[in-house]
UniProtKB/Swiss-Prot annotation:
It is found in: Cytoplasm. Heptamer of 7 subunits arranged in a ring. Interacts with the chaperonin GroEL. The keyword Chaperone applies. Belongs to the GroES chaperonin family. It comes from the Bacteria. This is Co-chaperonin GroES. The gene is groES. The lineage of its organism: Bacteria, Bacillati, Bacillota, Bacilli, Lactobacillales. InterPro entries: Chaperonin_GroES, Chaperonin_GroES_sf, Chaprnonin_Cpn10_CS, GroES-like_sf. Its main location: cytoplasm.
Length: 94
């Protein structure tokens, strides 16, 4: 399991469905601009200029929304995960 450093977050991005309910295949231009992901692991947080630790706003298990193409994909055992900075997370799904 990966342990992210600083303000980085490890996410498991949900697979996008390639077909609609009617069975039509979506063209590349019609894909969503955002993705839903589950937080797998969270770093300790960011440090301010004075050295104070700012705790992360997300926790393992949270479902979040990120933009497509953000972060770095990494292979962790048999899973592919994405590492992003906390600032790249747009929202937490309630």
């Amino acid at each position: 399991m990966l342990k992210p450093l600083g303000d980085r977050v490890v996410l498991k991005v949900e697979e996008e469905k390639e077909q609609t309910v009617g069975g039509f295949v979506l063209a590349g231009a019609s894909k969503e601009r955002t993705q839903v992901a589950t937080v797998v692991a969270v770093g300790d947080g960011a440090r301010t200029l004075t050295g104070e630790l700012v705790a992360p706003s997300v926790a393992a298990g949270d479902k979040v929304i990120i933009e497509n193409g953000v972060g770095i994909e990494v292979k962790d055992d048999d899973n592919t995960v994405t590492i992003v900075r906390e600032a790249d997370i747009l929202a937490i799904l309630a």
